[in-house]
């Protein structure tokens, strides 16, 4: 069975997709994004699927596609809330998981104005993002084997740090 080189987790706006693409290129590997698997299967954007199904049904669908993604080699990037599902966290225990971390201020800045992320829709985006991070932080800590912060750092710097981590393993 195939096994990912590394799995990327982190909140919305942390840079998982950007880092994932660059990391896959640096490793000469494929990138599998669980959000893209959902979009391909449903023919709709993840945010639209989330809005239509509601969070519990969306998380169930997401868990199915996360399990599928974890059967690929290469780099795997998971949606920001994938770690909310216990079965996903159990599967991640068997993998090298890098937590792409970001501050509240930077995460809000990066996701400002994005209507494609209903999980971030709020009257007070800063407070909402802070609450989201407070809820998810212990879960990211639980599943990750390595943490990299993206604040004020270029994607190249973040990728270099992850590559160094992978070489040390």
UniProtKB/Swiss-Prot annotation:
Pathway: Metabolic intermediate biosynthesis; chorismate biosynthesis; chorismate from D-erythrose 4-phosphate and phosphoenolpyruvate: step 5/7. Mg(2+) binds at residue 17. It is found in: Cytoplasm. GO terms for molecular function: ATP binding; magnesium ion binding; shikimate kinase activity. GO terms for biological process: amino acid biosynthetic process; aromatic amino acid family biosynthetic process; chorismate biosynthetic process. Substrate binds at residues 35, 59, 80, 136. It catalyses: shikimate + ATP = 3-phosphoshikimate + ADP + H(+). Binds 1 Mg(2+) ion per subunit. Its EC number is 2.7.1.71. The keyword Kinase applies. Catalyzes the specific phosphorylation of the 3-hydroxyl group of shikimic acid using ATP as a cosubstrate. Monomer. This is Shikimate kinase. It comes from Corynebacterium efficiens (strain DSM 44549 / YS-314 / AJ 12310 / JCM 11189 / NBRC 100395).
